[in-house]
């Protein structure tokens, strides 16, 4: 548990004590089960301990947009209520989630222990990181064509890396929902990118040739 970013630099004994103080609970969800139905007024913070989930939004026609993929160490819940009340979190594999009440984060316990301050700092770091990632996603979505959206997203996946390949974190259907594009049009554009020699595709492995 102490290897999670939210508990960074906090001793394992202090982590266990805080979880008990916070009345934290672990819940297990099967694939495709809804973990949270909306992020507003949930009053909880969730941390993915194992498995994966998607943060999703559905419009009035039932069209899905994937906001973010959540993996081990990802945080969600009340801290992301600014995204709106129509955001849900859905398990994409069997997963285990740790929950605790948001009020324990913002209200100091009577002891005002140092580990509580460190926890708050860690959450703020996670929030800052997520805001940067969401802004990068908005930049990708602002591109006019499906081709530019794909290449913009691919560039994000290799950002800061020496090699120029990656494994898609989504299925192709999920990727289309993440980029807010038609799946058939997206697959045609991926085919065009392959034929133009810009990318090489082997299953979910994609190599950027530029």
Spans of model-derived segments:
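Short acidic-glycine-tyrosine-enriched beta hairpin
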Residues: 11, 30-33, 59-76
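Glycine- and acidic-residue-biased ligand/ion/polar-headgroup-sensing regions
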Residues: 43-56, 72-73
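Cyclic-nucleotide recognition modules
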Residues: 66-124
């Amino acid at each position: 548990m102490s290897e999670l970013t939210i508990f960074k630099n906090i001793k394992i004994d202090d982590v266990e004590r805080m979880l008990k103080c916070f009345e934290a609970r672990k819940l297990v969800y099967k694939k495709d089960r809804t973990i949270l139905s909306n992020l507003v007024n949930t009053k909880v913070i969730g941390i993915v301990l194992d498995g994966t989930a998607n943060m999703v939004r559905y419009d009035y026609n039932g069209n899905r947009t994937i906001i973010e993929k959540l993996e081990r160490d990802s945080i969600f819940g009340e801290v992301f209520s600014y995204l709106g009340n129509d955001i849900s979190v859905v398990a994409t594999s069997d997963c285990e989630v740790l929950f605790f009440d948001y009020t324990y984060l913002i209200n100091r316990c009577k002891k005002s222990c140092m580990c509580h301050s460190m926890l708050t700092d860690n959450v703020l770091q996670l929030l800052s990181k997520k805001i940067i990632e969401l802004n990068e996603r908005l930049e990708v979505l602002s591109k006019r064509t499906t081709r530019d959206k794909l290449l913009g997203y691919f560039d994000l996946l290799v950002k800061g890396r020496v090699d120029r390949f990656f494994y898609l974190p989504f299925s192709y259907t999920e990727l289309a929902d993440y980029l807010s594009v038609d799946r058939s049009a997206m697959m045609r554009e991926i085919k065009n990118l392959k034929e133009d020699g810009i990318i090489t595709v082997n299953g979910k492995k994609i190599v950027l040739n530029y």
